[in-house]
Amino acid sequence: MSSGGLLLLLGLLTLWEVLTPVSSKDRPKFYELPADIGPCEDFTGAFHYSPREHECIEFIYGGCEGNANNFNTLEECET
């Protein structure tokens, strides 16, 4: 690859780093966990952060166990 190509690649990577939202960089690792309904059957609405969608998504939660990527409200998930 030519030096011009390398400089272009470096510039694009730098731009991508700058434009990546700070909130997604600072999210704890449990936000990478998938939505987990859990083994119980007390079905209720809950929210989890989707790294693929870069937003909080509603899902049906069974009411027990599951994992740490589980929030009662959209507001809790987004903070």
From Swiss-Prot:
What Pfam families does this protein map onto?
Kunitz_BPTI (PF00014)
Record key words, sorted: Disulfide bond, Protease inhibitor, Secreted, Serine protease inhibitor, Signal
Question: What is the tissue specificity?
Answer: Expressed by the venom gland.
Which GO cellular component terms, listed alphabetically, does the Swiss-Prot or TrEMBL entry include?
extracellular region
- Matches recorded under SMART domains: KU (SM00131)
Name any one GO molecular function: serine-type endopeptidase inhibitor activity
Q: List the disulfide bonds.
A: C40-C64, C56-C77
Domain BPTI/Kunitz inhibitor residues, every copy: 31-79
Q: Where in the cell is it found?
A: Secreted
Highest taxon above the source species: Eukaryota
InterPro entries on file:
Kunitz_BPTI (IPR002223), Kunitz_BPTI_sf (IPR036880), Prtase_inh_Kunz-CS (IPR020901), TFPI/VKTCI-like (IPR050098)
Residues of the signal peptide: 1-24
Family indicated by similarity: Belongs to the venom Kunitz-type family.
This chain's function reads:
Serine protease inhibitor.
Q: What is the designated name of this protein?
A: Kunitz-type serine protease inhibitor microlepidin-5
Species of origin reads Oxyuranus microlepidotus
